[in-house]
């Protein structure tokens, strides 16, 4: 598939690459992001097909805020005709290196470079929170065909797993961030979709077992680490690595996630 399958909009130019320092921070760490971030389980895409009311195979899908293409590649593997939309220079360049056969265009959810009613499905994997919903909701409804679906999802740390909760608390103390805010924000979006049609929610728990160094590299690819002082980040990663090696002497950890999926259907 080529990007010509989605007709570009003459009026919409690609938006600037990010709304904040945290959003822009991924561009300098794109290779690390691609190498160490978790993927998504097959059950997520089964749930997506169920809630969207259509198979991915043969669907015209635009993956917005595609990053390095983790979700884009999985959508393609399920048979979707998928186009990636990514605002960041570094992330888009890494996408092209990893997925030379998949189309990617520059833009973001606030000003989609796509024609009206051209997509069966819009996906935002770990990306909706970087948009301005007052702009992104009308854009999504403009680009979706009647009856098409908007799908938002996030890998959320499973804070009922003791070692993950302890690590999250350490991150919060060290960097002065609210590590539980992500789930609260998603819960709030589900309760008040802010102009979106009614959102249907599904959660999928999954896990991956990785070496401790891979887990630490995953941590270091998160925006709160990327915008922090390098010395402060290095100190935390060293301390946390020592703690994990004491707790898990075999050198591996099981990262457990809840993928929270929200799906809305455009009016017919």
PLM features: what roles do these ranges have?
Residues 62, 68-111:
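Class I SAM-dependent methyltransferase SAM/SAH-binding core
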Residues 135-210:
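Conserved catalytic/acceptor-binding region of the Class I
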């Amino acid at each position: 598939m080529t990007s010509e399958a989605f007709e570009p909009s003459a009026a919409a130019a690609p938006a600037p690459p990010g709304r904040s320092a945290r959003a822009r921070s991924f561009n300098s760490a794109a290779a690390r992001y691609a190498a160490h971030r978790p993927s998504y389980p097959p059950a997520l895409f089964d749930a997506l097909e169920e809630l969207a009311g259509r198979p991915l195979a043969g669907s015209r899908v635009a993956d917005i805020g595609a990053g390095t293409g983790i979700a884009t590649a999985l959508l393609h593997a399920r048979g979707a005709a998928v186009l990636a939309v990514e605002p960041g220079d570094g992330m888009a360049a890494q996408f092209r290196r990893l997925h030379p056969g998949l189309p990617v265009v520059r833009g973001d959810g606030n000003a989609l470079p796509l024609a009206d009613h051209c997509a069966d499905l819009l996906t935002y994997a770990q990306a909706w929170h970087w948009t301005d919903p007052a702009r992104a909701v009308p854009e999504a409804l403009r680009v979706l065909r009647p009856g098409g679906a908007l799908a938002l999802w996030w890998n959320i740390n499973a804070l009922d797993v003791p070692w993950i909760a302890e690590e999250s608390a350490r991150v919060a103390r060290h960097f002065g961030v609210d590590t539980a805010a992500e789930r609260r924000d998603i819960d709030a979006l589900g309760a008040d979709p802010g102009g979106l049609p009614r959102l249907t929610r599904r959660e999928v728990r999954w896990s991956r077992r990785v070496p401790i160094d891979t887990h630490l590299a995953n941590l270091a690819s998160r925006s709160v680490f990327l915008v922090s002082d390098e010395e402060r980040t290095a100190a935390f990663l060293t301390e946390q690595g020592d703690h994990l090696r004491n707790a898990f002497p075999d050198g591996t950890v099981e990262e457990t996630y809840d993928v929270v999926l929200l799906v809305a259907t455009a009016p017919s």
